[in-house]
């Protein structure tokens, strides 16, 4: 029988303590080995919370599947901010460039159900809106409308 453990760990900095240790200890795995493998797999996402699936097989072997951090975490890393606005809509805490927006959308596209980059960009803009982030000085709602009307082109890759 295969067991799956899902945890959210800091990229490249997982430790044997909670949430990891208590989740995998009872399964009979070498916790240090699992932690080392997770840290190796998540080192590119240092400073971000990363969803990780640990797939444990009957013979106590395991596989690690690394997910993509939430869009909000990618935005915060791109802007170098700690948190979004406490009063989005009235408060602006950062401004992304169009290139930064496209980079975040490209990263998230691997996990999104949307078919086109344009649709993923609109998903990211929704998160920007709820965090108090503008793009090129424009509100995310305004930019979404401009994309819909064809005033702003999103390249297809």
Swiss-Prot record:
Pfam families: Ribosomal_L11, Ribosomal_L11_N. Gene3D superfamilies: Ribosomal protein L11, C-terminal domain, Ribosomal protein L11/L12, N-terminal domain. InterPro entries: Ribosomal_uL11, Ribosomal_uL11_C, Ribosomal_uL11_C_sf, Ribosomal_uL11_CS, Ribosomal_uL11_N, Ribosomal_uL11_N_sf. Keywords: Ribonucleoprotein, Ribosomal protein, RNA-binding, rRNA-binding. CDD domains: Ribosomal_L11. GO terms for biological process: translation. PANTHER family: 60S RIBOSOMAL PROTEIN L12, LARGE RIBOSOMAL SUBUNIT PROTEIN UL11M. This is Large ribosomal subunit protein uL11. It comes from Archaeoglobus fulgidus (strain ATCC 49558 / DSM 4304 / JCM 9628 / NBRC 100126 / VC-16). The gene is rpl11.
